Amino acid sequence: ENKAEKHFSRKSGWLDLSRIRISVQYQKEWAQMFQESWRLQKEFFWTEDLSGVDWERVYQRYARLLPRIGSRSELSDLIWEMQGELGTSHAYEYGGDYPHAPRYPVGCLGADLVFDSKRRSWIFQKIYSGDIWKTNEHSPLAEPGVAVKEGDQLLAVGGVPVDEHKTPGELLVHQAGQFVPLTVIEGNQKKKGAKRKAKEARQIVVKTLFGEQKVRYREWVRNNVKTVESLTEGRVGYLHLPDMSTHGIAEFHRGYLAQVDREGLIVDARYNAGGMVSPLILEKLAHRHLGYDVPRWGSPESYPYHTLRGHLIVIANQFTGSDGDMFTTSFRQLQLGPLVGKRTWGGVIGIDGRYQLVDGTTTTQPQYSIWFHHAGWSVENHGVDPDIEVEDTPQSFIKNEDPLLARTVQEMLRLLKEKPVQSVSYSPSPRRLLPE
């Protein structure tokens, strides 16, 4: 077909759907959506009897509130409350025909800035380098040629001077992902007048970030690695599992392969958002060190390849959930090592999120439950209790302390003292002498 035949007309047969106007009676639409979400749970919940919940009675109880709904958000509240009667995790409702809220994307510099009242300027207190080789996952101030250091001063954003009243943040509103000129001066300069500052200042142009979560996450992980290495004199490794999906499996291999030869490994599963790759990670951790492949040229390699020879400890907290729950309870069942921290979230009935309501809302039906030999059905709605419970208080957060990691290192050092990991000591190589 050529372009002329695609024009909207009776001759072409193409209809311009954008000209169609539809009048929606929201009360009737919301009633239908409520009924549909109820029906989807009835048809797809993982047990036919919905774990004994009188689902017809639940519908009658909440349907009486439909005439009193006055907004789309109130419908969401009603669906959430109804699905909550199942007492089951992963029964969600999200999306739908909501009005678009105004957005004010702030351009991020991947740095902490503080105002210095003596120098009357903003100071780059901390610059988060992140992963310099990943686009949008490092501070733009760490780019080659920018040459901004911690302690340097920020004088202006986009040509507008900053002070205690005009902050960098407000000048970066609507500048996310944009090239923004910054006026900076070296931090080791003594207090000078405005004219002298202006003369010695220089202008740089950086492309701001849309957010700093990944940049700051990398800094947190690196600091934890350094802490563990320092406290154990390099004998113990550390890695973090942010989820059980693509990010999590990538982070696992990034940390695991670099530290697999240590005498111990701390696997931090705090804030693990779940996913589906826990069996792959458990398979790696469960492989035991059986021997070495010893070549003439090169270094000996563990057999099986990339297997641990030392102790394992997992850290978990109340934000470790879903496949994170399954990982921690399986770690215990396999007797790979102790669990340190807090009881996990407790939600292990899986979903696929394939069904949508008429306005695009997605509701999820808990369809895939799991039973463990050692725990039965008990992980759902309870979680996994740690072997060593440690409180993480607000006071610790304010002091920038990590009591869970500190207690884990303490436990690892105890294990290394009581059950030392033997260094490699080969027996003499066999002799193959010719017979006399």
Q: Which role fits each region the language model picked out?
A:
Residues 1-93, 224, 383:
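Sequence signature of WD/YWTD-type beta-propeller architectures
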Residues 1-19, 335-338, 354-365, 369-374, ...:
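C-terminal, active-site-flanking charged/polar segments
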Residues 9-10, 57-58, 71, 126, ...:
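Hydrophobic alpha-helical and helix-loop surface patches within well-folded domains
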Residues 27, 42-46, 131-141, 155, ...:
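Cleft-lining beta-strand/loop regions that shape enzyme active-site pockets
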Residues 37, 82, 239, 376, ...:
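A residue-level signal for conserved active-site and pocket-lining positions in enzyme catalytic cores
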Residues 67-123, 201-206, 210-224, 409-436:
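Extended, small/polar residue-biased N-terminal targeting/export presequences
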Residues 104-164, 245-246, 321, 368-369:
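PDZ/PDZ-like domain segments forming the peptide/carboxylate-binding groove
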Residues 261-263, 292, 372-436:
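In a subset of proteins, long, contiguous C-terminal domains/tails are tracked
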